[in-house]
């Protein structure tokens, strides 16, 4: 790992980030732009580059195209890139193909289950998928199951879900159905449907 960043600051070390640097991120991080970061990567002739996005940020998704164009493969838990406007979705895939880069996002739907890959493989093998059924929100499942089995107020159960890390960074995304909607759109687009969110 040569860099750790948030939306405004980063730590960069071409020899690898130490645990001390990581632990002291708040003190050691400096402001950066994507162009400065890419410049440092090129200056040090780094290879086998991988950008990992564990945010829920639309702003960071805007970095995907320049990262791919500068030699990065992508791994993302962020659903935004697969659910914003279809022209961006298509452009990202074209850019990945042009630069022969990979984009792994299996955790977008189904947590650790290989649901996206399975749907994609079935579709590409000629299967006509007409329906997908399941529980698409672990958060809502937890909330409803816990609420129906206890006397606790819903707000207390929600607080527990947030503290346990079950919700999206903004729990309103779960509660208003946006998270489920994004997951369903991701699966629809894997079936070559050009739907929008």
Which residues make up each language-model segment?
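N-terminal glycine-/serine-/threonine-rich beta1-alpha1-beta2 phosphate-ribose binding loop
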Residues: 1-70
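General beta-strand structural signal in soluble alpha/beta enzymes
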Residues: 3-4, 50-53, 74-77, 103-107, ...
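A generic secondary-structure micro-motif detector
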Residues: 53-54, 82, 147, 174
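Rossmann-fold NAD(P)-binding glycine/threonine-rich loop
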Residues: 55-70, 78-107, 111-122
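Glycine-enriched alpha-helix->loop->beta-strand junction motifs that scaffold or abut catalytic
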Residues: 70-74, 138
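Core active-site phosphate/anionic-ligand binding loop and the adjoining beta-turn-alpha structural block
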Residues: 87, 100-197
């Amino acid at each position: 790992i040569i860099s750790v960043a948030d939306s405004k600051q980063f730590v960069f070390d071409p020899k690898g980030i130490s645990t001390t640097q990581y632990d002291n991120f708040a003190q050691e991080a400096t402001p950066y732009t994507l162009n400065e970061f890419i410049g440092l990567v090129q200056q040090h002739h780094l290879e086998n580059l991988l950008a990992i996005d564990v945010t829920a940020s639309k702003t960071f998704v805007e970095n995907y195209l320049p990262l791919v164009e500068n030699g990065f493969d992508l791994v993302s838990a962020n659903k935004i890139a697969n659910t914003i406007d279809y022209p961006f979705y298509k452009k990202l895939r074209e850019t990945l193909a042009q630069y022969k880069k990979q984009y792994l996002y299996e955790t977008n739907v189904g947590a650790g289950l290989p649901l996206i890959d399975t749907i994609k493989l079935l579709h590409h093998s000629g299967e006509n998928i007409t329906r997908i059924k399941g529980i698409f929100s672990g958060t809502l499942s937890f909330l409803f199951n816990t609420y129906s089995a206890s006397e606790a107020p819903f707000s207390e159960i929600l607080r527990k879900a947030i503290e346990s890390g079950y919700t999206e960074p903004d729990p309103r995304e779960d509660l208003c159905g946006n998270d489920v909607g994004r997951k369903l759109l991701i699966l629809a687009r894997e079936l070559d449907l050009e739907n929008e969110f």
